[in-house]
């Protein structure tokens, strides 16, 4: 049988020409940039996301990383609690949780629920010990199923009720063609960390640029991520950050 590898999700498409040209034009940029990311890029990402999500995000909410995967790993290291992980899921969530010494609470999803957990299934996990901290990983559109979560409001109510933090992995969100993508941040922005980047829609997986958008209500967590980032990757490649400004300020709807 043929085995399809979904671990990397390598895009078969080329990077838009204007973004490639922006990288060429900024190849000379050789200075360390601010650890949280180039100010102009964070501003562009915040404005782009605010329009997409209909919520007012600020540059201060944005953390630029060398791929969203690295930022997720830092989150696992920092988080003191248990990880609620739907199954099946992307290959690196569980190993990162183990490396971060966090216990995994796995929820086996079902076809009838579109391969996403229900609110009651999440609540059942939390009720085992309400005194613990919980972090839910929600990947929609999903790798490997390709499905979109349709019970976002139900899950958001559980998040609000039990102070559940949600990592919303939206790396494939620009590649939803059958229906308009909806983020769980539309229902509970104060509990949601948005994770995405250039790898999929832009075809720039090898450039290694991703970002977190962390709401003001989770500032303590954001500041802790910044501290860890400063002691690990320090800053993302300067030429790539400058080039990425074009990705979030120009219209690429025809490309997508």
What does each model-found stretch correspond to?
Residues 21, 190-256:
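Conserved core segment of the aminotransferase class I/II
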Residues 56-62, 81-82, 190-191:
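Short acidic capping loops at alpha-helix termini that bridge into adjacent secondary structure
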